[in-house]
Each structure stands twice: as C-alpha cells, then as structure tokens.
Design a protein with these regions (language model features):
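Catalytic phosphate/metal-binding cores of nucleic-acid and nucleotide-processing enzymes, i.e., regions
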Residues: 1-150
Length: 150
C-alpha cells in the first residue's frame, strides 16, 4: 500500500514490514552524498573537516528519515537495508563500494539518532544490499528498510 507521500508499507504472512526513505538532491557537487574516498580525504585534510562532513551527511539522512518515516520505529528487529543509488549519468563515475560504505554508515547513525533503531549492531541490522543505476535527472538514493523479526 502506498500513501500520497510515496511511503510504502507492506505486510505479509511472515509479519515482515517494509518502509522506504528517499534522499533526493545534489548535496555534494552533482552527487547526492560524498563517497568514502571523499570522507577519507577530508579527515586527512583535518579531523574536524572530516567530522563536519560526516555530521552534514548524517543530517541529510535525518531529514529524509523524518520526512518519510514520520516517527515510525522498528518493533520487530532485525532489519535488512536495501539501497538503490541513482547516480548522475554525466560526470565522473565513482567506485560503488565507496559510495555505499559512506552512505550506509551515515544512514545507520541517523536511524539511531532518530530512534528508529536502538543500535546498529548485528542484533538490529543483519544485512544490506545495494544496487546502482544511472539517471539523467536528479540523483537520489532509495533505501528500503525491511523488518524481518526473529
């Protein structure tokens, strides 16, 4: 079932629930978020610069979580996070692993800060998947939170 905001909740017989979060926009040049290589460069330049980059990315994730989840909390952990990255078709192509790693770190921290999950340890987040696509429109990241339960 999809509501007017594009938020999707699916329930099935094994009581799995799925929610989606979208991070849309160009927050880092022509990309949605920086990659791990960009973060390492910032930390090498100055630790506070790297910390600021991480904090900025986390706040972008927090804004998206608040917009799409509207106070929803995981009640039946663990969860699996499914990421779909829509990168700009023009410009520099980036290493998929580095894009995913940094986004995953910032997003899981944001989930904790928003109290969607209590922790990002394996009791709460057991797995993740990631796919990459190219778009000639605005870049974005789609994150599906699948509540698996024990």
């Amino acid at each position: 079932m999809t509501d007017m905001n594009g938020e999707t909740e699916v329930s099935n017989l094994n009581s799995s629930t799925t929610k989606k979060v979208f991070i849309r926009g160009r927050f880092y040049g022509d990309k949605t978020l920086p990659s791990l290589n960009d973060a390492i460069s910032e930390y090498a330049r100055h630790p506070k610069a790297g910390g600021k980059m991480k904090n900025d990315c986390k706040w972008i994730c927090i804004a998206a979580i608040r917009k799409y989840l509207k106070g929803w909390k995981v009640t039946n952990p663990p969860i699996i996070l499914h990421y779909k990255f829509y990168e700009p078709i023009k410009g520099q192509k980036r290493d998929y692993g580095n894009i995913f790693d940094w986004c995953d770190k910032c997003f899981q921290d944001a989930l904790q800060d928003c109290k969607v999950i209590d922790n990002d340890n394996p009791d709460w987040v057991t797995n993740f998947t990631h796919e990459f696509f190219y778009t000639d429109g605005e870049p974005y990241i789609e994150i599906e939170i699948e509540e698996k339960g024990r």
